[in-house]
A protein has these predicted regions:
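Alpha/beta-hydrolase active-site loop
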Residues: 102-123
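Short amphipathic alpha-helix adjacent to the substrate-entry channel of hydrolases
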Residues: 77-94
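Short beta-strand element of the alpha/beta-hydrolase
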Residues: 61-71
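The feature captures the conserved acid-bearing segment of alpha/beta-hydrolase catalytic domains
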Residues: 158-180, 189-228, 232, 236
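C-terminal catalytic histidine-bearing segment of alpha/beta-hydrolase fold enzymes
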Residues: 212, 228, 235-271
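N-terminal cap/lid segment of alpha/beta-hydrolase-fold proteins
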Residues: 19-60
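Bacterial Sec-dependent N-terminal signal peptides
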Residues: 1-24
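Primarily recognizes the serine-hydrolase "nucleophile elbow" in alpha/beta-hydrolase
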Residues: 119-182, 194
């Protein structure tokens, strides 16, 4: 399945979002610790990295996007994507611990903790916990899929992963992440599908899954094909709400900009 997206379509959708949101005031609360209630696990590095920012409108019942940055699980920092600002939604931008200071599954645990924090706190800001979307680019897309498909991570916090309204990974691994393979001494050209691969956790009852990649000829090698296989296997498993978008002419980094337009279009279903 190959969906080619056209700029004019997204310009129109962005304009409509902006029109709906132009009179709304937005607030930004920064560097909130999302694991400070876990003193037994706390250390200086956790205290430094396990923080989030929340950008939110002064309205009620809004959708929230939990956003995980990319960087190969070795680099990167939280940010509020410009294309998600002033769209009538909240954005929770998350920092998480990174290799080599930690190893798997520390960063997956952090991602789950941040999503759980959002479920438990978003009503205080006016958001609807039934309208929480999880998304991220590259490594962030991988974390998105892991916390949404392998239910054990959120279950640690008393949260059912099926309560996530939508999963929207941007160009994320669906096999075991290359950094996890590196930690095990496995070459990055050797694919692995084990418990740390989203593909291992395909299931019919998962939240709606919107897979987005760049052009297969310009993406990181194999990234489109991984996601296409994920799309197919979710269909075979009986999941009826998986979509796959391939953004024609965009590479791995460049695909994020038009992918935000896809995200905004998809989450309109939650209004």
């Amino acid at each position: 399945m190959r969906l080619i997206l056209f700029t004019c379509f997204f310009c129109i959708s962005s304009f409509l979002f902006a029109q709906n949101s132009k009179s709304v005031t937005y607030h930004l609360d920064e560097n909130i610790s999302y694991r400070d209630a876990e003193p037994k696990n706390n250390d200086d590095y956790m205290n430094e990295r396990c923080r989030l920012d929340i950008y939110y409108p002064d309205t009620k019942n809004f959708t929230t996007v939990v956003w995980f940055h990319g960087g190969g699980i070795t680099s990167g920092n939280k940010f509020i994507p410009e294309k998600l600002k002033e769209q009538g939604i909240a954005v929770v931008a998350v920092n998480y611990r990174l290799h080599p200071k930690v190893k798997c599954p520390a960063y997956i645990e952090d991602a789950a903790a941040a999503v759980a924090w959002t479920f438990k706190n978003i009503q205080k800001y006016g958001g609807n916990p039934a309208k929480i979307v999880v998304s991220g680019h590259s490594a962030g897309g991988y974390l998105t899929s892991m916390v949404g498909l392998d239910k054990k991570w959120l279950a640690e916090y008393g949260i059912d992963a099926n309560d996530i309204a939508m999963l929207i990974p941007f160009s994320g691994h669906t096999i075991t992440h290359m950094t996890i393979r590196e930690e095990r001494g496995i070459p990055d050209t050797q694919p692995v599908v084990d418990e740390f691969a989203p593909l291992y956790h395909v299931r019919s009852d998962a939240p709606p899954l919107i897979l987005i990649t760049g052009d297969r000829e310009r993406e990181m090698l194999g990234r489109y094909e991984e996601n296409a296989y994920m799309w197919r296997m979710m269909k075979i498993a009986g999941h009826t709400k998986t979509k796959l978008y391939e953004l024609d002419s965009f590479d791995h980094g460049g695909m994020a900009s038009p992918a935000f337009e896809v995200l905004l279009q998809e989450i309109k279903a939650l209004e």
